[in-house]
Design a protein with these regions (language model features):
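Nuclease-adjacent, charged terminal/linker segments that flank catalytic cores
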Residues: 1-74
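A short mid-domain helix/strand-loop element embedded in enzyme catalytic domains
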Residues: 48-58, 89-96, 120-123
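Extracellular-facing segments of soluble proteins and assemblies that are Gly/Ser/Thr-biased and enriched
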Residues: 62-101
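Short, well-structured alpha-helical interface segments that form or flank functional binding sites
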Residues: 70, 74, 78, 112, ...
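Active-site metal-binding core of divalent-cation-utilizing nuclease and nuclease-like domains
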Residues: 89-119
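Conserved catalytic cores of phosphodiester-cleaving nucleases, focusing on short active-site segments
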Residues: 117-130
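Catalytic cores of nucleic-acid endonucleases
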Residues: 128-175
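Charged, structured surface patches that assemble and position nucleic-acid processing machinery
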Residues: 171-196
Length: 196
């Protein structure tokens, strides 16, 4: 299975659904506030009613106001579904994070991002990144931090997919090749290995 293609197809479906939801909720407080703020940002060159009608009748305008699928944990949910894994909590007493000593901690301040899954004997972080740039490099740094700190005392994995990781996954594997506590893979690799 090519997980990148699967995610992109599901994101398209989510965009269509998100536009439908936006249009159904056009008169809700949240949508009205978005419209009002947009009109105010453009200092009255359009009215709230014009924007409202645009959302209802113009796909391009609606697409600018609907929720963005990348902010809805779609890839994480799809990875869980495809791999048959249960998502770990991102906060609270069952959250898994690592401090500078490689110890499991529950608080976010000064510690790694939380583990997303348990993959066999590994605490795993999962990322899907489809573009290049600064925000994506921040995600890469989060993954490296998770692997470095977590591997001090535990087995940790990075499940990384998308165009960005197609480029950086081999570099990451090279960086951690001598660390027996680190696994770097992708949903695509895992599903292909299951078939064999």
């Amino acid at each position: 299975m090519n997980f990148t293609n699967y995610v992109e197809e599901k994101k398209k479906e989510a965009r269509i659904k998100n536009i439908e939801i936006l249009r159904k909720e056009i008169d809700s407080f949240d949508v009205r506030e978005k419209i009002k703020n947009h009109v105010m940002a453009f200092e009255g060159i359009m009215s709230e009613e014009e924007v409202r009608e645009g959302i209802l009748n113009n796909l391009i305008i609606a697409s600018k106001f609907c929720k963005e699928p990348s902010k809805q944990n779609i890839s994480e949910n799809l990875a869980a579904e495809v791999l048959g894994l249960k998502k770990l909590p991102t906060s609270g007493k069952n959250c898994i994070r690592f401090n500078d000593k490689g110890e499991i901690v529950r608080t976010s301040s000064g510690n790694t991002k939380s583990a997303d899954f348990i993959l066999g004997e590994y605490y795993a972080t999962q990322k899907y990144t489809d573009g290049m740039g600064g925000a994506q490099d921040n995600q890469r740094n989060d993954v490296i931090d998770f692997l470095k700190r977590g591997s001090i005392n535990y087995k940790v994995a990075a499940i990384v997919d998308g165009a960005y990781w197609d480029k950086y996954r081999p570099i990451l594997k090279k960086e951690f090749e001598n660390n027996p506590n680190v696994l770097i893979t992708s949903v695509t690799e895992i599903t292909e290995n299951i078939k064999e």
